[in-house]
Amino acid sequence: MAGSLSEIKAKIISTEKTSKITSAMRMVSSAKLVKSEQAARDFQIYASKIRQITTDLLKSELTIGSDNPMLVSRPVKKTGYIVITSDKGLVGGYNSKILKSVMDMITEYHADGDYEIISIGSVGSDFFKARGMNVAFELRGLADQPSFEQVRQIISQSVDMFVNEIFDELYVCYNHHVNSLTSQVRVQQMLPISDLVADEAAEEGVTGFELEPNRHDILDQLLPQFTESLIYGAIIDAKTAEHAAGMTAMQTATDNAKNVINDLTIQYNRARQAAITQEITEIVAGANALE
């Protein structure tokens, strides 16, 4: 019985230590989430402005017939997917949701292997390579608050692959942050830029201004920046969802640890009570034997 009590006590102490670790990790993820949410809000100001300007230029009569390759839809022979995952685990179902979605798309639409994968995140890279799937480019070790400089190269490589007709359309697959408890898998088309002409230009656009050298040249410079901003925005969004998933996972782990501790404590008290009862019984029996 003494051995059983010591084993239960050891389990309680071990679980309490685990609970402290997961609680600390939850607090760290929570702090990262707050920073990421603020970064996403700040970036949205820039993203909405560049979208407004780009839309307005595209709707003007001088550029509506632009032959910029980023605007031209062509027969789709191959599709590119930028897949954003985390670099580590402990984020609940964050990675499994997006990877399952990507694999379902590949199974349904790309049985002939007519796709290219650009992976951001070690989990995704390892997942695809373990299945013998080619990863054209990858980025590992993404910072908790990624700067544009850190992701500039892989974004530029993705855009160049489309422009050079290595693939004919480009999508970003990631977890969209809804709130601290919820994220949604999002598969968003980035290229060709097919939705802008249909958008309504903002009330205060640029069509009323004289632009130099000309609208075509400005648009040619602006479109890559616009596409890069869309992809970078998706990366920030995905990072925010990752931190939220990490916070939720660690909160769940902490709650589960507390439940285990409660169950073990009850088990310990019952075992201790049984041991005391047995000792009393033995003492009484011994006393009776001496009479």
Swiss-Prot record:
Q: How does it sit in the membrane?
A: Peripheral membrane protein
Q: Provide the protein's localization.
A: Cell membrane
Main localization is membrane
**What Pfam families would the database entry show?**
ATP-synt (PF00231)
A cellular component term from Gene Ontology for this protein is: proton-transporting ATP synthase complex
Cross-referenced CDD domains? F1-ATPase_gamma
- Which GO molecular function entries does the Swiss-Prot or TrEMBL record give? ATP binding; proton-transporting ATP synthase activity, rotational mechanism
Q: Does the record carry Lipid biosynthesis as a key word? A: no
Q: Which PROSITE patterns match?
A: ATPASE_GAMMA
* Alphabetical GO biological process terms: proton motive force-driven plasma membrane ATP synthesis
**Keyword annotations from UniProtKB, A to Z:** ATP synthesis, Cell membrane, CF(1), Hydrogen ion transport, Ion transport, Membrane, Transport
* Highest taxon in the source lineage: Bacteria
Q: What does this protein do?
A: Produces ATP from ADP in the presence of a proton gradient across the membrane. The gamma chain is believed to be important in regulating ATPase activity and the flow of protons through the CF(0) complex.
Protein name (database record): ATP synthase gamma chain
| Native source organism of the sequence | Streptococcus pyogenes serotype M1
What is the name of the gene encoding this protein? atpG
